[in-house]
Amino acid sequence: VEFNAKLCIMNMAVHGLNAKIKSGDEANSFYHDAHNLEGCCDYVMANPPFNVDKVKSESTQNAGRLPFGLPGVNAKKEVSNANYLWVSYFYAYLNDVGRAGFVMAASSTDSGNKEREIRKQLIQTGHVDCMISVANNFFYKVSLPCSLWFFDKGKKEELKDKVLFIDARNYYTVVDRTLNEWSEWQMKNLNAIVWLYRGEVDKYEKLLMDYRTQIIGDCYELDTEFEALSVLLKGYGGKLMELRQQVADTILHVEHINQLLPLNEMLKHYTAELNSSLKAFIEYG
């Protein structure tokens, strides 16, 4: 790591740029608060690495930002899972009305021992706003499920003793075999739940109007597509009647099997043309 930092400094110098590049414990977020953000942030958004282990507890303690104390420390004086260090940091960075939203391993929502005590203290602050359980396969490299945590130090007084829990583990859109996501409308639906919980009915009503507008537009497009399909089928109705008559006349006057070959080719042509038109209609409307 130290070599990489020196290499980076040299690269910046070659390009005529000044930079402060740190390495070792000085560059480790657990052991050093490089930006002195405690109590400064209006907003915190983060997707920290999950389940980091072997974090030196003494160095972490000295770096501060632990309003609820250290999570569990093992016999080697190491924090064996740093998830709750991140949770504590994000909370500590908020100012008096700050809000935080971050991704955390799903296992952190019900972990025991000292982490359970930290969760209890968090809830007692009245600043835990919402928790959302998310399905697996929401990351390209990680298949495990996760959860979304939201803090709000400026919560309304009537919500101080409440926490909204949303179980969205079965709510997603499949992108492919290894990846899920929320569609635009699915995210709006999750927002709607939060709005109603907070009493923001006007936002919910606006979303309903957006839905109404979308549905009306979809119905208009559907009517147009049905009309086009009807015209297409009527056109082929006449061709099919003509084809039927040609088949009947050919069969009536056929004297040898070879005389049916042109009829076979004609049927193939009509079938291919019909399939092509229907396919184009289905794909492009």
What does each of the following model-derived ranges do?
Residues 1, 25-32, 104-109, 136-137:
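Conserved short loop/turn motifs at secondary-structure junctions
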Residues 38-285:
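A conserved structural/catalytic subdomain of Rossmann-like adenosyl-cofactor enzymes
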